[in-house]
Regions:
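Interaction-mediating elements
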Residues: 1-112
Length: 112
């Protein structure tokens, strides 16, 4: 049950939001055992983000929570796909994207 959040200072159109959601759905499958059918996504544009002391640089913070554990190679492939996606869809340079992953040992869905 992965959860991916994208927070950026870039304005996101409806079509860009849909493209991001599709791309994140594809990228999450690079993590073993994860699929788009379990994925929840939060996309937030036009946030007040200061990067390198400036508010005029396109930047993004992507956080990902996953149940269980995956190896480093899977996460690296996921991160590469996500940074490419943000560059393609929102023109955010790779160096202006911060990503984190938290592995959650207990994840509750459907109240169980």
């Amino acid at each position: 049950m992965p959860m991916v959040g994208v927070i950026t200072n870039v304005s996101i159109s409806g079509s860009a939001r849909a493209e991001l959601a599709r791309g994140l759905g594809e990228a999450v499958q690079l993590i073993p055992g994860k699929s788009e059918s379990q994925l929840m996504i939060k996309i937030e544009g036009e946030s007040a983000i200061y990067f390198k002391g400036r508010d005029d640089l396109p930047a993004a913070y992507v956080w990902t929570d996953v149940s269980g554990h995956a190896d480093g190679a899977a996460y690296k492939a996921f991160w590469a796909a996500v940074t490419r996606l943000l560059g393609k869809v929102l023109a955010i340079p790779v160096g202006n994207v911060y990503l984190t992953v938290r592995e959650i040992p207990v994840w509750v869905v459907n109240g169980e």
